[in-house]
Amino acid sequence: MKSKIIFTTIIAAALATGCDKFLDVHPKGEKINMFETAEEYEDALYGVYSELTGSNLYGQHLIILPEVMSQNFTTSDYKYAELAEGEMTSSGSTSTKKEIWKDAYEAINHINNIVEHAEDDIDTYKHSRLYLGEALALRAFVHYEVLKLFGPPYWASDSEKKTTIPYVTKYSFDISPLLSYDEVCRNILEDLKRA
């Protein structure tokens, strides 16, 4: 009986101390270093690709919306039908655009987290430069897609000076300022050169 009590006490003590890190709860938005191995960089990049295939991005809206807006095909879906008719302020079209904006910048924020950690670990892992380059190219790509939808057409007069979208380069939940078309394009090209 005495050995059962000792055995149970040892098991309980091991379980209570072994879960310490697992049970830690971090406030939402707190930056956590989840990149302790090269595989974790790959997992984070796979996570971003998975985000990009969501229905608000390349899984649906980001593919269909430009086609409908350019009237390459018609649809009976009320959100897309309104956009095809040039109605940009109705509730259906506005919610679609908000969903794209939110999910795109959420993906960009996750990409920025990878970029910041990859820059710190540039000489730590065999493929650190590859992870950094891939993340920078993804950041440029997603910003370019957002610019295409929410920025002025490039052929419009003074389009290069018009305020368009924020170009977010830091992992943060703060609101970033809107930049001109030229500044966004310059940032895209800079990220692509670095990649």
Where are the predicted features?
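Bacterial Sec-dependent N-terminal signal peptides
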Residues: M1-K28
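Membrane-proximal, proline-rich intrinsically disordered regions
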Residues: C19-I63
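A structural signal for short, hydrophobic/glycine-enriched beta-strand patches
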Residues: E39, P66-S91, K170
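Inward-facing hydrophobic residues that define packing positions of alpha-helical scaffold repeats
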Residues: L45, I108-I111, C185, L192
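Secretory-pathway/luminal and periplasmic proteins that interact with or process carbohydrate-rich
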Residues: T53-Y58, N72-T75, V142-P153
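Conserved, well-structured interaction surfaces
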Residues: Y80-F150, P177-E183
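Short coil/linker segments at helix-helix boundaries
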Residues: L149-R186, E190
